């Protein structure tokens, strides 16, 4: 009888000590500041290389490995949400607005900054798929980091950003785990910071208004539709800061919506059936006209120089072209504007 009680007691203790329950408690702060107080960051970029991202690494961030204490098989993931307005995108990631000139790229996720999820939009999204703790006590953390973005074309300037609420991360129990009344959401505010933004550009050495005298020709020199004859030539010269790549767009001043390669003649022209095309350097393909804008990627924008040239220039050739509508002799006048983009 004595031996029976000893065995029963041993089995009871073994079963008792392996019973555990999933549990979670909040050990973090509900309000958290991202980045150092009064941070200051400096960078230099070409004027139209926009949006321009300040490569601040993980310096503007918040990281805490101990926000929730979990145990006993508790399963937890993380969701994140940004409350700032979306003002653009870069490589599929939202740019969030802080001021008219400054925006943010934002990442949220687990404790490790490098695993942060690039945030897009203003809805809750999965930023950490999660894990299940074993029969022991551990913690779940989180991280947020941001990078400032210059949004608008401007000369060199200093931008100050005030403390701003940016969004939240919430703990997401799964696989039967429940948080009960435990705090699941933490909020984040971006500490104030200053950007010292230096821009580089170019100076036009050629007069801003260039008149190209067009040679007189006879209709017989353009016998068929599409035939061309050189009418005149000119050059554009610039002086650039180091590292600036110059792009340019021609705009048809008479018909700004023109996206073809034939310049519209002005109302002062009396000739018909003839147009003007513009070529650069030794190109065999005429330049097309686009919107009057310096924005990077502007329609029909073309590269004038590389970033290694500080004194770039381009030779332009104007050619008459038979438009196929029957040529009637007269005067030919056309006006095109050039817009430079410093990238």
From Swiss-Prot:
GO terms for biological process: adhesion of symbiont to host; cell adhesion involved in single-species biofilm formation. Residues 23-199 are annotated as: Receptor-binding lectin domain. It is found in: Fimbrium. InterPro entries: Adhesion_dom_fimbrial (IPR000259), Adhesion_dom_fimbrial_sf (IPR036937), Adhesion_dom_sf (IPR008966), Bact_Fimbrial_Adh_Pro (IPR050263), Fimbrial_adhesin_lectin_dom (IPR015303). It holds the Pfam family Fimbrial. Residues 1-22 form the signal peptide. Residues 200-343 are annotated as: Fimbrillin-binding domain. It comes from the Bacteria. GO terms for molecular function: carbohydrate binding. Keywords: Disulfide bond, Fimbrium, Lectin, Signal, Virulence. Disulfide bonds join 75-132. The keyword Cell cycle does not apply. Residues 298-307 have a biased composition (Polar residues). Residues 287-307 are annotated as: Disordered. Its main location: other. One of its GO terms (cellular component) is pilus. The keyword Nucleotide-binding does not apply. A carbohydrate binds at residues 65-66, 110-111, 138-141. Essential fimbrial adhesion factor that mediates binding to N-acetylglucosamine-containing receptors in the host intestinal microvilli, leading to colonization of the intestinal tissue, and diarrhea or septicemia. Also confers adhesiveness to laminin and basement membranes. Belongs to the fimbrial protein family. This is F17c-G fimbrial adhesin.
């Amino acid at each position: 009888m004595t031996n029976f009680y000893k065995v029963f007691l041993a089995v009871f203790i073994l079963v008792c000590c392996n019973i555990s329950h999933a549990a979670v408690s909040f050990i973090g702060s509900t309000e958290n500041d991202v980045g150092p107080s009064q941070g200051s960051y400096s960078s230099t970029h070409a004027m139209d290389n926009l949006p321009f991202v300040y490569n601040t690494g993980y310096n503007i961030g918040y990281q805490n490995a101990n926000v929730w204490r979990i145990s006993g098989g508790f399963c937890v993931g993380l969701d994140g949400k940004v409350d700032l307005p979306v003002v653009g995108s870069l490589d599929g990631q939202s740019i969030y607005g802080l001021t008219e000139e400054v925006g943010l790229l934002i990442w949220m996720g687990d404790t490790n900054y490098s695993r942060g999820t690039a945030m897009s939009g203003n809805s809750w999204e999965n930023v950490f798929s999660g894990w299940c703790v074993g029969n022991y006590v551990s913690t779940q953390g989180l991280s947020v980091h941001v990078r400032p973005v210059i949004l608008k074309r401007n000369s060199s300037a200093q931008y100050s950003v005030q403390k701003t609420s940016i969004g939240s991360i919430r703990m997401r129990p799964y696989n039967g785990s429940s948080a009960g009344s435990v705090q699941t959401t933490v909020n984040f505010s971006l500490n104030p910071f200053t950007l010292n933004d230096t821009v580089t550009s170019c100076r036009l050495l050629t007069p801003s208004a260039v008149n190209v005298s067009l040679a007189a020709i006879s209709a017989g020199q353009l016998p068929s539709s599409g035939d061309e004859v050189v009418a005149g030539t000119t050059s554009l010269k610039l002086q650039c800061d180091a590292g600036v790549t110059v792009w340019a767009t021609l705009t048809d001043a008479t018909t700004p919506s023109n996206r073809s390669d034939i310049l519209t003649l002005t109302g002062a022209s009396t000739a018909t059936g003839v147009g003007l095309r513009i070529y650069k350097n030794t190109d065999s393909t005429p330049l097309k006209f686009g919107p009057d804008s310096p924005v990077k990627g502007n329609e029909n924008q073309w590269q004038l120089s590389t970033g290694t040239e500080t004194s770039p220039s381009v030779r332009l050739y104007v050619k008459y072209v038979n438009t196929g509508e029957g040529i009637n002799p007269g005067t030919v006048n056309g006006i095109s504007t050039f817009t430079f983009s410093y990238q």
